[in-house]
Amino acid sequence: MVESVPMTREGYNKIKAEINRMENEEMPMIVQKIAEAREEGDLKENAEYHAQRENQGMLMAKINELRDKIARASIIDVSSLPKDEVVFGCTVTVEDVAYGDEEQFTLVGAGDEDYDSGKILVTSPFGQGLVGKKVGETAEVDVPAGKLKFKILKIEFNL
């Protein structure tokens, strides 16, 4: 069964733009560099040629990965979701029960994730551990080191 990838319209458009940029800017540059390296002669010992072919393969893999996300995209209208529980698109403030630390996360879809600014994938194990919880409830999240417990302090929507 193919798993859908939840995302906002903005996230979808961002991924489409990234694919377009890769196909129309990066790929032609790599193809040009391959052609230039090919003109150097013997391909068996041509390091530049082999490096650019490898770059081309890695770029194609990235393009295909993004195309797969787009093909499985499920565009979510955040305004239609419940406002009293942790769901896609909300910003949730939690307290680490073990340490008392307060943290804030926004649950986002593919294309919108930015871990440095607290935007985590709703499909990640951490995101899934929070989904469906209400203010005052405790979420248990499985991590390699065991289970972490987080108390839900606040749920907000920035619509």
UniProtKB/Swiss-Prot annotation:
One of its GO terms (molecular function) is DNA binding. Residues 53-73 form a coiled coil. PROSITE patterns: GREAB_1. Gene3D superfamilies: Transcription elongation factor, GreA/GreB, C-terminal domain, Transcription elongation factor, GreA/GreB, N-terminal domain. It comes from the Bacteria. One of its GO terms (biological process) is regulation of DNA-templated transcription elongation. Keywords: Coiled coil, DNA-binding, Transcription, Transcription regulation. PANTHER family: TRANSCRIPTION ELONGATION FACTOR GREA (PTHR30437:SF4). Belongs to the GreA/GreB family. Necessary for efficient RNA polymerase transcription elongation past template-encoded arresting sites. The arresting sites in DNA have the property of trapping a certain fraction of elongating RNA polymerases that pass through, resulting in locked ternary complexes. Cleavage of the nascent transcript by cleavage factors such as GreA or GreB allows the resumption of elongation from the new 3'terminus. GreA releases sequences of 2 to 3 nucleotides. This is Transcription elongation factor GreA. It comes from Rhodopirellula baltica (strain DSM 10527 / NCIMB 13988 / SH1).
